[in-house]
Amino acid sequence: CRDLAKRHVDEPDVPAAPDGADGYAEWVQIALILYRVELEKSLRETEDYLNEMRGILAVFDLDEAPHYSSFCRWENEYRMRELRRLLRRSAEQAGWSGEAAIDASGFQRDQTSYHYRDRANYSFQSMKTTILIDVNSLAIKDAHFTTQKAWDGHIGMQVFRRNAEDLRVLSADANYSWSDLREECRSNSTRPLIKHREQTPLQKAHNARMNEDYNQRWMSETGFSQLKEDDGEKLRSRSWHGQFRELTRKCIIHNLTQAAS
């Protein structure tokens, strides 16, 4: 976490707490909110744990842990744009080959945001998460989140356009079968391994021809299973935007784990 955070910020050599107990360097803030994901502890538990583990505090160049309210404030301050940059950087650290699969799964929401539910006029207990994952390294390059019903083809197009320059192959099941998405891939020199809906003999033949190369797509399911280990399927943030950020932080920690393995 610390090394990724230092590579991400503009001033990595700033002392961890340049202003004493009231201020912390940007790299420390990023590193600690990511480390809390790895710990899987509450805000108060994280503060207590760090104060008991002086060796870990020393890794972050700290004498004592920040107050638990600081963790909460930092997690709310770092927006999705910043977290996406961290996610892409962590994917590169884990090893990005350009051969990727796209897939979706649901994460259970422990606490529903009633305000958002009323605004959206939609009742939900799970958050649909779509990830772009390297089939060789299991590095997650991008993630898309929604609490509403959305067609996979449209989501796939958004994810592809954000990452087109880093993709050589894109694998997806028939839920993403859309001629526009295939053409978008080809126009960006990306090979689309997207299953057809088997409504005609020709579509069945197309699917049969790509089976050998397509079979690595199951690695996306492995990525989801790793994200959901140790009760990781449940989200604890109260707001929908907080849950988007929470899941993105989980993906970053997943990448760092893959890089270290």
Predicted feature locations:
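Basic, short loop/linker segments at the boundary and entry of helix-turn-helix/winged-helix-like folds
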Residues: C1-E38
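Polybasic low-complexity intrinsically disordered regions
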Residues: A17-W27, E38, D48, F71-N188, ...
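Short helix-capping/linker segments at secondary-structure and domain boundaries
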Residues: L39-E45, D231-L235, L256-S261
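Short coil turns linking two alpha-helices in DNA-binding domains
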Residues: S42, H67-S70
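DNA-recognition alpha helix
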Residues: R44-F60
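A short alpha->loop->secondary-structure connector
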Residues: L62-P66
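Helix-centered, glycine/charged polyanion-binding patches within enzymatic domains
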Residues: V169, A174-H241
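Charge-patterned, long linear interaction tracts outside catalytic cores
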Residues: R238-S261
